[in-house]
């Protein structure tokens, strides 16, 4: 327990130091974007693992809505894009005790050379008062709208996000209903490094038998959409229950697994 507390305190201190350093660089005009190729889906996967760990024992689902036309490789400052998303996700997880945190990424205004990446993070937390929403992106601003939470950090996180988004020529904003939910969103233009959508898989891989069964309808629909993006038709839960086909990979959650573990093991044999 002591080691865990030390780690948490150390991480918090490191985040504060990083915020101050980034803010100082931006204010002095020394912050530079480092543009290079990056894989957005790989970034999203890493973030998923990171935040499932941070959610821990909370009764919160981490949901995704990813545009299937998102190219495999983009060209931009992927580390700063990741930093912006992490900062907003951190706040969403911190202020949501039950319900969901949803990361959505859409492709807009796409040309042969570039596209607009439209990112939103929505949560079912306690929301933010309208008068406080205007302060969120100001430097050293900490609002106490959110119930039962103490102020933490420097108050620089969202200000840094705003400045990074603006450096990329984009816009950032928030929509919130106090007592219900919040949605932070931003848009940035990114170059397309390789016109290769996430859907691309070698032909021999498209014969894979992939099934999915989730207790949550939203998760089920998103799973099927992502699998179809790879050119594979997923095996639906009713087909698996009725015909018991062989599947190479089966994705499920704990509730479904515990209820149907015998049938699941039979399909994978």
Task: Report each predicted region and the residues it spans.
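Short conserved segment of the HATPase_c
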Residues: 128-142
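Helix-loop junction within the histidine kinase core
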Residues: 24-35
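Disordered, acidic interdomain junction associated with two-component signaling
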Residues: 65, 87, 110-114, 131, ...
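Glycine-rich ATP-binding loops of the HATPase_c
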Residues: 169-175
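Short alpha-helical Gxxx[C/S/T] motif in the catalytic ATP-binding
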Residues: 152, 157, 161, 173
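Short alpha-helical segment of the dimerization/phosphotransfer core of two-component systems
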Residues: 8-13
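Cytosolic transmitter module of two-component histidine kinases
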Residues: 59, 200-262, 269
């Amino acid at each position: 327990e002591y080691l865990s507390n030390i780690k948490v305190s150390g991480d918090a201190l490191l985040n504060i130091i990083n915020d101050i350093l980034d803010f100082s660089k931006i204010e002095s005009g020394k912050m530079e974007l480092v543009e290079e190729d990056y894989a957005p889906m790989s970034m999203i996967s890493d973030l998923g693992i990171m935040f499932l760990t941070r959610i821990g024992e909370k009764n919160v689902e981490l949901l995704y809505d990813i545009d299937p036309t998102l190219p495999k490789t983009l060209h931009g400052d992927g580390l700063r894009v990741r930093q912006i998303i992490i900062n907003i996700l951190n706040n969403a997880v911190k202020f949501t005790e039950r319900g969901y945190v949803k990361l959505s990424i859409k492709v807009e205004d796409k040309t042969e050379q570039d596209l607009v990446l439209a990112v939103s993070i929505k949560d079912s937390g306690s929301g933010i008062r309208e008068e406080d929403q205007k302060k969120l992106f100001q430097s050293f601003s900490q609002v106490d709208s959110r119930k039962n939470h103490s102020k933490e950090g420097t108050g620089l996180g969202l200000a840094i996000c705003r400045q990074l988004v603006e450096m990329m020529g984009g816009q950032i904003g928030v929509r919130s209903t106090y007592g219900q939910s919040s949605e932070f969103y931003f848009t940035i233009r990114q170059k397309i490094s390789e016109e290769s959508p996430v859907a691309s898989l070698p032909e021999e891989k498209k014969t894979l038998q992939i099934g999915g069964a989730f207790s949550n309808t939203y998760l089920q629909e998103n799973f099927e959409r992502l699998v179809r993006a790879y050119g594979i038709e997923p095996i639906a839960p009713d087909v698996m229950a009725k015909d018991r086909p062989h599947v190479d990979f089966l994705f499920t959650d704990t509730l479904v697994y515990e209820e149907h573990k015998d049938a699941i093991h039979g399909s994978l044999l």
